[in-house]
Amino acid sequence: MSDNSKIRVVVGMSGGVDSSVTALLLKEQGYDVIGIFMKNWDDTDEFGVCTATEDYKDVAAVADQIGIPYYSVNFEKEYWDRVFEYFLAEYRAGRTPNPDVMCNKEIKFKAFLDYALTLGADYVATGHYAQVKRDQDGLVHMLRGKDNNKDQTYFLSQLSQEQLQKTMFPLGHLEKPEVRAIAERAGLATAKKKDSTGICFIGEKNFKEFLSQYLPAQPGRMMTLEGRDMGQHAGLMYYTIGQRGGLGIGGQHGGDNEPWFVVGKDLSQNILYVGQGFYHDNLMSTSLDASQVHFTKEMPEEFTMECTAKFRYRQPDSKVTVTVKGDKAVVNFDKPQRAITPGQGVVFYDGDECLGGGLIDRAYKNGQVLQYI
């Protein structure tokens, strides 16, 4: 049996149950484990309590329980420069960004990995629900987590082969209830802590309120694609393609009582387009353009492949044909897709293997671009 005690694994510990169990399992498997708490955002909750301080206390309690050293490292500047500025720029451009994808790419598997290597790490580990499979020739494949409901490969799709080579996902073969049960059996301080929701730096706060602190809202006209005035919107950045709530128009307009949805945006004119019906014609597209396309292993500069794709988290896979040129791709859908949203990720799969992905730029219907920006 190999001696794991000579293999140093640095675990990103958030103060949550998933990363706590990650550290516990690695320690039980005999690895030389170090816990690191990343402080990425300077924040207090509505009661004036610094949430990072509370989370760090939980990390300290768990690390003491399982007997591993732990440290805190501050990545606030890197986070602001590499994730938050991107997040704001995307909203300014009328898009709907996915900061978790960028946070994994730039912070958890870049800034954190670089820091871990200075501590002599052989690997880093996180509490993500994903799996890595290592070939004999050293190539690493990223597979979906066993818990379909928790699988996080969508958010990890921008990781490189070099990053995956250095990564372990000890929870990948477990389902969430099993992870909680392990934490409770071990009496970990975080066993009953509820999962965090929302964007990492916003936490539980009101999204609209938070965004308006950084981007001035520009109210404008809300109308149908036929040109009928439907009142005023609060600012394009507050709406995403396919959204239903928050429009304030109910069923009072139009002959039928079908609900209203965001069906388009015109950033240059500051117009929000709305229409009735979940499957409104303007919400259905047949292809998309993506940029920043990246694969987890080396691929040819230009190629075409058939695979499946996700266009948002927790969505069932859809069959697609992908034509790649450099870091751009055209993705044609076997069946029309609803609410393909610029700024979100498109992620490619071959069975359970996550191949990589890109960021959605434009959606098309039978070759015609849909006005989503």
Swiss-Prot record:
Record GO biological process: tRNA wobble position uridine thiolation
Alphabetical keyword list: ATP-binding, Cytoplasm, Disulfide bond, Nucleotide-binding, RNA-binding, Transferase, tRNA processing, tRNA-binding
Keyword Aminoacyl-tRNA synthetase in record: no
A single GO cellular-component term on record: cytoplasm
Chain sites annotated for binding ATP: 12-19, 38, 127
EC number: 2.8.1.13
Descriptive protein name: tRNA-specific 2-thiouridylase MnmA
Species of provenance: Streptococcus sanguinis (strain SK36)
